C-alpha cells in the first residue's frame, strides 16, 4: 500500500480530514527547501505538495508564478527537486510527497528516467497540471509501475466523461479545483463545491482534496466539511515570501498547526 493510501486510510479510520500544504521547491532559498518541508510536517501536514518550478505556469496565479520565477532564478530544476525529496526522506519516511508541476520538465528529463529517479528518491505522487487525463493512460501506467500515484485535477467545468476518465487512471487522491481561474483566487463558494463532490465520488473511488482560494483556518474548516482533504498553496508561498528568514520555518509550522486544529474540529463535531 502506498504512503498516500496509508495516510488517507489512517485519516478515515480516525474520522479526520487531510491537510495538504503546497510550497514551491527552491523558494525563497533552495538551501532551505527540506527544512521548510519538515516545518510543514511538524505543523500537521498529512501530504506535502512540492511545486516544480516552471517558466510558464499557466494554472497558477501571480503569487505562485512569482515564486516559480524566483526558484528558477536560483537555478532550481526538476533534478534539484527530486534531490530535495531524497534528503527529506533521510529523516521523514512517513509523510507523502507529491510533485506538482508541468509536463515540460518531465518530458525533457524523459518519463522513464523521471519515474526511476522519483521512485528512488521517495516521491509518492505526481500531479502534472497540463496533462489531460484522456491522453494520460500510458503516463499513469508508467507512474504506477514505479509505485508513484498519478494525481489529476478536476474542476467545476469537468464533464462526467472526464471525471470517469480520471476514475480509470488516477490513484492516491484527486485534486478538485474549487474555482474557475488560477490559484490564489478568491470568492470560494462552499455550497457549489458540496454540490459537485457527489458526482466525483460516484465515478472516482479516491479521496477528494479541494484547493484554490483557501487562505485561512476558517475557510479550510468550511471546505473540510464537504471534502476529504484541503489543499493550501498560495497562502503558504506568501507566508514564506513575507516572513523574516529566521522566523520562516516557525511561521509555517504555526500556520499549518492552526489549520490542522480547525480541520480536527470538523472530525470532533461529527
From Swiss-Prot:
List, from the UniProt record, the residues annotated as the active site of this protein. 49, 60
Query: Pfam families under this entry?
Result: Trp_syntA
Which InterPro entries does UniProt cross-reference here? Aldolase_TIM (IPR013785), RibuloseP-bd_barrel (IPR011060), Trp_synthase_alpha_AS (IPR018204), Trp_synthase_suA (IPR002028)
A molecular function (GO) held by this record is: tryptophan synthase activity
State the superkingdom. Bacteria
- Pathway the protein takes part in: Amino-acid biosynthesis; L-tryptophan biosynthesis; L-tryptophan from chorismate: step 5/5
Please list which residues make up the signal peptide. Answer: none
Instruction: Give the UniProt keywords, A-Z.
Output: Amino-acid biosynthesis, Aromatic amino acid biosynthesis, Lyase, Tryptophan biosynthesis
Q: Per its UniProt record, what CDD domains does this chain match?
A: Tryptophan_synthase_alpha
Listed EC numbers = 4.2.1.20
Catalytically driven reaction(s): (1S,2R)-1-C-(indol-3-yl)glycerol 3-phosphate + L-serine = D-glyceraldehyde 3-phosphate + L-tryptophan + H2O
Decide whether keyword Plastid is in the record: no
Keyword rRNA-binding listed? The answer is no
- Write down any Gene Ontology CC term: cytosol
By sequence similarity, the record places it as follows:
Belongs to the TrpA family.
**So what does this one do?**
The alpha subunit is responsible for the aldol cleavage of indoleglycerol phosphate to indole and glyceraldehyde 3-phosphate.
Give the multimer and partner information. Tetramer of two alpha and two beta chains.
Protein name as it appears in the record: Tryptophan synthase alpha chain
**Source organism of the structure:** Paraburkholderia phytofirmans (strain DSM 17436 / LMG 22146 / PsJN)
Amino acid at each position: 500500500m502506498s504512503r498516500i493510501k496509508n495516510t488517507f486510510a489512517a485519516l478515515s479510520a480516525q474520522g479526520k480530514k487531510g491537510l495538504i500544504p503546497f510550497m514551491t521547491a527552491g523558494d525563497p532559498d533552495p538551501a532551505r527547501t527540506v527544512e521548510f518541508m519538515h516545518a510543514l510536517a511538524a505543523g500537521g501536514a498529512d501530504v506535502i505538495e512540492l511545486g516544480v518550478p516552471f517558466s510558464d505556469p499557466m494554472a497558477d496565479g501571480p503569487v505562485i508564478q512569482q515564486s516559480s520565477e524566483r526558484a528558477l532564478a536560483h537555478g532550481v530544476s526538476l533534478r534539484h527537486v527530486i534531490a530535495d525529496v531524497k534528503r527529506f526522506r533521510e529523516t521523514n519516511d512517513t509523510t507523502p510527497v507529491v510533485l506538482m508541476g508541468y509536463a515540460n520538465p518531465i518530458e525533457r528529463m524523459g518519463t522513464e528516467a523521471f519515474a526511476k529517479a522519483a521512485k528512488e528518491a521517495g516521491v509518492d505522487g505526481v500531479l502534472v497540471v497540463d496533462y489531460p487525463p484522456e491522453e494520460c493512460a500510458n503516463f499513469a501506467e508508467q507512474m504506477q509501475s514505479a509505485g508513484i500515484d498519478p494525481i489529476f485535477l478536476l474542476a467545476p467545468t469537468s464533464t462526467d466523461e472526464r471525471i470517469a476518465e480520471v476514475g480509470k487512471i488516477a490513484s492516491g487522491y484527486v485534486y478538485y479545483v474549487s474555482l474557475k481561474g488560477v490559484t490564489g483566487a478568491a470568492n470560494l463558494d462552499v455550497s457549489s463545491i458540496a454540490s459537485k463532490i457527489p458526482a466525483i465520488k460516484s465515478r472516482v473511488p479516491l479521496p477528494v482534496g479541494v484547493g484554490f482560494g483557501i487562505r485561512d483556518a476558517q475557510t479550510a474548516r468550511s471546505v473540510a466539511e464537504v471534502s476529504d482533504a484541503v489543499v493550501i498553496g498560495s497562502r503558504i508561498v506568501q507566508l514564506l515570501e513575507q516572513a523574516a528568514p529566521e522566523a520562516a520555518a516557525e511561521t509555517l509550522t504555526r500556520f499549518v498547526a492552526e489549520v490542522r486544529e480547525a480541520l480536527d474540529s470538523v472530525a470532533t463535531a461529527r
